[in-house]
């Protein structure tokens, strides 16, 4: 393996190492979600995936992303690092907010705007719907990070949340 001092033979300094970790973690997450036809950077491109999606398929897709976020060693360790360090560094606080809140809310808001336009979702404020959809997921990930023994309970709550959201805001097409 690589010893800590030899890392500096490959990177200019601590910031370069950190930047490489950020880039690698984002790439791994994007590659995983792309296999599920979810592209957080391209809500418009994902509309065909979610237009007409069934409740069970949606719940399964969200569960897969949730479990990946919890159990991928790099993704999980990086999220936990940012969770702790956000209180010591304004830059890391901003990164945490962008990566785990703003980015996800913006993606879902754009996706929901398009799905409202196609008639898939009821006509409501897409930004509020996005907050309502994303926030419980983030909360449940936080619970699992702090209390891993509650994972099964959180997965049940995640499924119940996604299914309730679907039944509440999905238009029944005849």
Regions found by a protein language model. Give the residues of each.
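Amphipathic alpha-helical packing segments from all-alpha helical-bundle domains
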Residues: 33, 71, 76-83, 90-117
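Helix-turn-helix
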Residues: 1-24
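Alpha-helical structural segments
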Residues: 16-64, 95, 99-110, 156, ...
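A short secondary-structure junction motif
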Residues: 28-32, 36, 40, 89, ...
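Hydrophobic/aromatic-rich alpha-helical bundle segments in the mid-to-C-terminal region
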Residues: 94, 98, 102, 112-163
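C-terminal effector-binding regulatory domain of bacterial HTH transcription factors
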Residues: 167-174
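Amphipathic alpha-helical segments that line or abut small-molecule/effector binding pockets
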Residues: 51-71, 76-84, 127, 131, ...
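Residues in soluble alpha-helical coiled-coils and helical-bundle/repeat scaffolds
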Residues: 12-16, 20, 70, 87, ...
């Amino acid at each position: 393996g690589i010893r800590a001092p030899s890392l500096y033979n490959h990177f200019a300094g601590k910031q370069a190492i950190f930047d490489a970790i950020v880039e690698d973690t984002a790439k791994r997450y994007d590659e995983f979600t792309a296999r599920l036809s979810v592209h957080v950077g391209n809500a418009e491109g994902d509309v065909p995936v979610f237009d007409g999606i069934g409740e069970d398929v949606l719940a399964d897709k969200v569960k897969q992303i949730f479990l990946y976020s919890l159990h991928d060693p790099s993704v999980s360790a990086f999220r936990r690092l940012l969770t702790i360090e956000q209180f010591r560094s304004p830059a890391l606080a901003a990164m945490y907010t962008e990566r785990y809140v703003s980015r996800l809310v913006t993606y879902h808001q754009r996706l929901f705007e398009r799905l409202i336009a196609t008639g898939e979702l009821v006509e409501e404020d897409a930004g509020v719907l996005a907050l309502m959809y994303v926030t419980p997921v983030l909360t449940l990930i936080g619970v699992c990070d702090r209390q891993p023994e509650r994972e099964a309970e959180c997965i049940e709550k995640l499924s119940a949340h996604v299914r309730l959201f679907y039944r509440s805001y999905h238009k029944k097409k005849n």
